[in-house]
Amino acid sequence: MIKELDTVVLSRDLSEHSLKRGDIGAVVHSYKEGKAFEIEFITGQGDTVTVATLNSEDVRLMQGKEILHVRKLQAA
């Protein structure tokens, strides 16, 4: 179950925010017993890209054996 402060992985592209499936975010708030979340996505330097309200099917928990990947953020 996803909870506040968990690291999550985006399950689909969010082109309106220049985010792609696989991007990493942090849960900053949970709604409706975990059916929706406020997720903050940041750059490698810690600048906020966006805070998006997403449904539980839009994200998944990051797994322990996964590795991060870097890509350049494209303007929306």
Feature-to-residue mapping (PLM):
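Basic/aromatic-rich interaction segments and small domains that mediate binding to polyanionic partners
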Residues: 2-65
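Long, low-complexity intrinsically disordered regions
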Residues: 64-76
